[in-house]
């Protein structure tokens, strides 16, 4: 969502805006470090295109994917942050030709995120939650969204071209990929692109829902008043 990158762009010194493939790529610096920022768009194909352009045209040497996701375990609550250590495309199924979840012709099921980026992201998010969150988001706003004591987690991400918001969808993923702790629609696809190009990646998401139709919040309010500050806190910390 555009709101999720607005705060990054506000703090970024934008030197150039490149438009290609119906996308805008903001080129410049954050805290004097060169970077490129773009809206990935929604879904596996859209985000893969964005990632490929980042790598091919702008020669980025690492990628950070941020945004929101659905939680898949009791421990991962709305308002928490999750850093992916690895990812799987939960809707990839070419059986009987290839095993379920395996990417055809790559012989890969699980894409591992860069360990250094994972640790940097985890530390940045933990510092933000512990020391800076209330500078951006009031306790009253957090309480209104039923966010009480945000935590940071690390674990398996699953991605697919469908919004997971019903109990049958939720239970299917939990049964087939029991180690997964959060779900969204882009990260594992970008991970495949980064795997093929050998570019380090980390995926970091804040939890906006429980992916099971039970716990709901005002999504737009969450994005506008909470999630975008999480995103900026992550980026600011990793750019230090």
Region locations from a protein language model:
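N-terminal short beta-loop-beta anion/metal-coordinating cradle
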Residues: 1-52, 58
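Active-site-proximal beta-strand elements of phosphoester/diester hydrolases
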Residues: 36-40, 154-158, 204
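Glycine-rich phosphate-binding loop signature in dinucleotide/nucleotide-binding domains
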Residues: 54-61, 197-199
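Structural motif
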Residues: 62-64, 181
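Mid-sequence, gly/pro-rich, charge-dense loop/helix-turn segments that line enzyme active sites
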Residues: 73-177
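A C-terminal functional module that forms or caps the active site or interfaces directly
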Residues: 158-213
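His/Asp/Glu-rich mid-to-C-terminal helical/loop segments that flank catalytic regions of hydrolases
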Residues: 211-240
């Amino acid at each position: 969502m555009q709101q999720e990158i607005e705060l990054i762009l506000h703090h970024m010194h934008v030197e150039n805006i490149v438009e290609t493939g119906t996308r805008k790529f903001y080129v410049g610096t954050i805290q004097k470090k060169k970077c490129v920022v773009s809206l990935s768009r929604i879904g596996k194909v859209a985000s893969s295109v964005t990632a490929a352009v980042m790598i091919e045209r702008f020669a980025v040497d690492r990628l950070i994917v941020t945004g929101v996701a659905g939680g898949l375990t009791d421990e991962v609550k709305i308002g928490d942050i999750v850093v992916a250590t690895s990812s799987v495309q939960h809707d990839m199924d070419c059986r009987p030709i290839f095993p379920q979840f395996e990417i055809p012709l790559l012989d890969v099921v699980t894409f591992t995120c860069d360990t250094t980026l994972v640790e940097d992201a985890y530390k940045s998010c933990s510092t933000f939650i512990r020391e800076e969150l209330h500078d951006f988001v009031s306790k009253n706003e957090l309480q209104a969204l039923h966010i009480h004591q945000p935590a940071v987690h690390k674990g398996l991400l699953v991605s697919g071209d469908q919004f997971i918001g019903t109990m049958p969808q939720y239970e299917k993923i939990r049964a087939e990929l029991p180690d997964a702790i959060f779900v969204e629609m882009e990260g594992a696809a970008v991970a495949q692109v980064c795997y093929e190009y050998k570019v380090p990646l980390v995926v970091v998401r804040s939890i906006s829902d429980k992916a099971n139709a039970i716990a709901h919040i005002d999504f737009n309010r969450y994005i506008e008043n909470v999630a975008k500050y999480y995103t900026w806190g992550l980026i600011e910390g990793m750019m230090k």
